Amino acid sequence: MLKKGLTATAAVGAATLSAPALSQARQEWRMVTTWPKNFPGLGVGAENLAKRITTMSGGRLSVKVFSAGELVPPLQSLDAVINGSAEMSHGAAYYWQNKNVGLSFFTGVPYGMTSREHAAWVRFLGGQQIWDEIYDQFGVQGFLSGDTGTQAGGWFRKEIKTVADLKGLRFRTPGLGGQVWAKLGASVTNLAAGEIFQALQAGTLDAAEFVGPYNDLALGFYQIAKNYYMPSFIEPGLATEAVVSKSKFRALPADLQEIVRSACQAEYDNVASDMYANDPRALQTLVDKHGVKVLKFSDEILKAGADASAEVLAGVRNSDNALAKKTAESFVAALTLLRTRADVTDSPYLVAREKFFKFK
């Protein structure tokens, strides 16, 4: 009887300890990225996110980063999470618009939201819930993980002044913005960051846009093209994403799930500040040391771009793709609301500062 009682007691004790023991188990996740190793802002942001999760969890969840091409090709990063080759990826949702065009809205939209507006939509105006619906189909979960702010319009071998100058232009530009440029006559393609310079150098591209001065300086585009158009009207605010395997994420204890969420939020803010601080410094270097010409798109191109953007958005909103349609409707409703704030705060303030405040 004593032996039987001891056995029963041991079983109860083991059951009691099992849940805490599991919650303390150490795991390692693999994060694949679309960014080159040590890439300013975005690639470093992925590394920082991995470090945050590892540190905040006390090592219970450690994340090992594989930069573009180290484990899978950069534009197969999401597929690696879907098929289980990695637990996590870091990139931009509009790279996957072939899976659902609605995903483009979670990166940035031509003539759409600024960075703060976009974050407001995703976090407080229903965007995250729709994003979850789209990614549910693939067994993954997406989180905002960084933001570049308003991007540069691109690098061009020759100056472009009219819409006619765009006809047949071989241009690297992804997402809905790529569709806009295609409507304006460009021949559009998408390439990963590390592939763009070679394409420009080989002459297979006439123009390329990626992010802005901070990243573009590192990629060396100025060595091939000197005409740098700013700002972008197709990427007024561009967010990056961290994607996790939904089954792996849900298997985590509640505190580790919250650590992943909080780490993504913290790194989103960190990347945004990093980009704002270093873009102007990099631009000065491009101009002063490398002879880059900073140009603005003509009103003709801006107006044609706006019209084409409206056509692209209308096409998504009127499509048979229910989730893409739902995404577009939610985005446009949020943009309409958020413009009422911008119209009486940010926009007039920036005009007034530029016009009247000359203090240095």
Describe the predicted segments one by one.
Residues 6-14, 23-118, 130-360:
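N-terminal secretory/targeting leader peptides
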